Regions:
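Short cysteine clusters
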Residues: 45-48
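Short cysteine/histidine-rich metal-coordination sites, predominantly Zn2+-binding motifs
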Residues: 61-68
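Regulatory, intrinsically disordered low-complexity regions in eukaryotic nuclear proteins
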Residues: 51-52
Length: 176
């Protein structure tokens, strides 16, 4: 009795791992933002909040890739969200590029968080475009989904962080 080939499942596994690592990177970014806000007392400015929303939307695309498998639609969500986040980050970088301007908030390794945000969004665009090219064979008709407990926990943690960020924004700005 012939068995079903497992090449799709096995060859899709590196993509699954890379998408999980990208989602973990988004979670770390949101945690660092929370640390600066809650522990160091640096209240985020409106542009910072928009960058966090961009991060959450990028994370949503990666979470969908982890949960449902790689998809061109998921990568499009990631790329469009990262372009928007990069635009907001670049706007903030350009606001503080004047001579003598010390920037907004604390610096991490010499760069402010909005500069790191721009770098991260641009890296996300490049990574997602590369994955979109590499994952084409897995997107065409592959309906096998790799789901692990670690992936589910990571998605849950991301959703919890996103809810925390949205709650923080509502408490900071109000609903109106």
């Amino acid at each position: 009795m012939p068995s079903l080939p497992m090449t799709t499942r096995v060859s899709a596994y590196p993509s699954y791992i890379l998408n999980m690592l990208a989602l973990a990177g988004i979670c770390v970014s949101l945690l660092v933002a929370f640390f600066f806000q809650l522990v160091l007392g640096e209240i985020p400015c409106p542009l910072c909040m928009l960058q966090r929303v961009g991060l959450m939307l990028v994370g949503l695309g990666f979470a969908m890739n982890v949960r449902f498998g790689p998809s061109a639609t998921h990568y499009a969500i990631i790329i469009l969200s990262a372009i928007t986040g990069a635009g907001v980050s670049l706007r903030q970088v350009l606001l503080h590029i004047a001579p003598g301007d010390t920037g907004f908030g604390s610096a991490i390794f010499g760069y402010h968080m909005y500069t790191w945000g721009f770098i991260a969004f641009m890296a996300t665009i490049i990574f997602s475009a590369f994955m979109l090219m590499v994952d084409r064979k897995h997107m065409a008709g592959s309906n096998q989904i790799i789901q692990t407990a670690l992936g589910s926990v990571l998605i849950g943690f991301f959703l919890l962080l996103s809810l925390g960020n949205l709650t923080s924004d509502v408490l900071t700005c109000g609903l109106a």
